[in-house]
Amino acid sequence: IRTHTLPCKCHICGKAFSRPWLLQGHIRTHTGEKPFNCQHCQRAFA
């Protein structure tokens, strides 16, 4: 039984999330954005 709403919806694929930050992380799967860099090897991560 789902007890919460899913107000945050992806405008690309329509997947819904309960929190804005979950949607923000999901959007990165579409855009390829990798904003976090490793301080040791400089690789970027989402």
Curated annotation (Swiss-Prot):
It holds the Pfam family zf-C2H2. Its main location: nucleus. It is found in: Nucleus. It comes from the Eukaryota. Coiled coil: none annotated. A zinc finger (C2H2-type) spans 1-4, 8-30, 36-46. Keywords: DNA-binding, Metal-binding, Nucleus, Repeat, Zinc, Zinc-finger. InterPro entries: Snail/Krueppel_Znf, Znf_C2H2_sf, Znf_C2H2_type. One of its GO terms (molecular function) is RNA polymerase II cis-regulatory region sequence-specific DNA binding. GO terms for cellular component: nucleus. Belongs to the snail C2H2-type zinc-finger protein family. This is Escargot/snail protein homolog.
